[in-house]
């Protein structure tokens, strides 16, 4: 009898852990995603009213009843979805990811699963995701929905995780009810807004043990297989990613990195180099220092910083998802609009070296990265003080090297896999000097 039980348990385990097989549409969507290279991240919610970032409920220990007053002040009458989409498109972005529901538990869409949403609780009373979805379709921009697995508002997000412990006024509900709630909302997002690009999960890390260096054991069951299967059933092409800072789980279609180029390890919570999988990659970064609107945030990144980060992301084989935090009136800060316009001008001129490329043959550094496509390798020289470049162990067979966008040849020598390139001082660009290598395939 025991032997039979063991066999049944083993069989069940194999079934439950069966390797996820993406559909043909999903694989095509992955390729599109890798080719797209650049997207707009939008963190927007009722927290913008306070002008202190998207974590204000946690950081200021605002109680549930106190936070419930915020939606009454949220009336973004200057929100223009088409204007946002055109801003992204003119910046060279191919997709938009927007917060449908952040950690504060407030839904930015009309939901039957919870009355705590923009349509039912704000004077604005409109579904901003619906308006954005329509504008994205009109202008051929894909739309992804950010969805928080962490919730500082609901009673049934229980047991609590590591954050939000100072927020009072919540009961002790049932975890299975929370899972059902998430499934209901995800079903709405995948059925009421047309064809979407995918779901961008965040917050799983809240339930993981943390020793200051690595995430450890998880304390609850997020029912990932059930949730991921539901998403792929409703929209097989939809891409799933999760900002859990760990190796990808079965069912995920791309791997994301927060404020950290893949494998670089500049953040405490950075994903280990050993945990980088074979999925398409995406790094998200802020245009200033905050995700949600922050009135006092003056850390606006320069044109050079933003463009070089896009280039570096491509050199690491990754997309860049660049974030803005709109104001509570529905407008985006003028400084951020201007920054996106500058990126757009650069990418119109040099986008060929970014779009549809893959990681190049050299290990990326802060001074030099490479991208490649169609028999071309593009060297991006980010250090304007360099006049000579030496690349050891470069075993590609070179036909010629020229400055990208011109016919001017670049002097070089290539002996015993040691490549030396001699730059013309007059051709060095302060942001990015791009060399086009014609490679024998």
Question: Where are the predicted features?
Answer:
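Positively charged n-region of N-terminal signal peptides that target proteins for export
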Residues: 1-4, 88
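Sec-dependent N-terminal signal peptides
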Residues: 4-13
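Sec/Tat signal peptide C-region and signal peptidase I cleavage site
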Residues: 14-18
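Mature catalytic domains of secreted/periplasmic carbohydrate-active enzymes
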Residues: 19-441
């Amino acid at each position: 009898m025991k032997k039979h039980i063991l066999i049944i348990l083993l069989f069940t385990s194999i079934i439950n852990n069966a390797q996820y097989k993406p559909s043909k549409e999903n694989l095509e969507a992955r390729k599109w995603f890798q080719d797209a290279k650049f997207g707009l991240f939008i963190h927007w919610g009722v927290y913008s009213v306070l002008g202190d970032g998207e974590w204000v409920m946690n950081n200021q220990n605002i109680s549930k009843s106190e936070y419930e007053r915020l939606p009454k002040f949220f009336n973004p009458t200057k929100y223009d979805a088409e204007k946002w989409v055109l801003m992204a498109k003119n910046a060279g972005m191919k997709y938009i990811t927007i917060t449908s529901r952040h950690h504060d538990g407030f839904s930015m869409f009309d939901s039957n699963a919870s009355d705590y949403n923009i349509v039912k609780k704000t004077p604005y009373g409109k579904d901003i995701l619906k308006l954005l979805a329509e504008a994205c379709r009109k202008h051929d921009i894909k739309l992804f929905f950010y969805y928080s697995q962490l919730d500082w508002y609901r009673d049934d997000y229980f047991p609590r995780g590591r954050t939000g412990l100072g927020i009072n006024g919540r009961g002790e509900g049932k975890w299975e009810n929370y899972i059902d709630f998430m499934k209901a909302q995800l079903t709405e997002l995948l059925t009421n807004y047309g064809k979407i690009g995918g779901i961008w999960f965040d917050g799983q890390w809240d339930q993981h043990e943390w020793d200051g260096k690595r995430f450890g054991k998880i304390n609850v069951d997020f029912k990932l297989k059930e949730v991921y299967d539901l998403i792929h059933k409703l929209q097989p092409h939809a891409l799933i990613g999760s900002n859990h800072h760990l190796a990808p789980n079965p069912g995920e279609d791309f791997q994301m990195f927060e404020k950290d180029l893949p494998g670089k390890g500049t953040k405490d919570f950075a994903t280990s180099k050993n945990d980088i999988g074979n999925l398409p990659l995406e790094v998200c970064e802020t245009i200033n220092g905050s995700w949600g609107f922050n009135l006092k945030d003056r850390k606006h990144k320069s044109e050079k910083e933003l463009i070089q980060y896009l280039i570096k992301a491509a050199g690491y084989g990754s997309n860049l998802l660049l974030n803005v935090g709109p104001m509570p009136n529905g407008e985006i800060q003028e400084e951020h609009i201007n920054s996106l316009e500058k990126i757009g001008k650069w990418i119109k001129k040099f986008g060929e070296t970014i779009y549809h490329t893959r990681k190049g043959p050299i290990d990326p550094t802060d001074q030099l990265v490479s991208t490649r496509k169609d028999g071309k390798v593009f060297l991006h020289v980010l250090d304007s003080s360099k006049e000579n470049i030496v690349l050891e162990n470069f075993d590609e067979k070179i036909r010629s090297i020229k400055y990208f966008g011109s016919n001017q040849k670049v002097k070089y020598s290539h002996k015993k896999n040691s490549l030396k390139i001699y730059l013309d001082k007059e051709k060095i660009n302060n942001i990015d000097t791009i060399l086009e290598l014609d490679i024998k395939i």
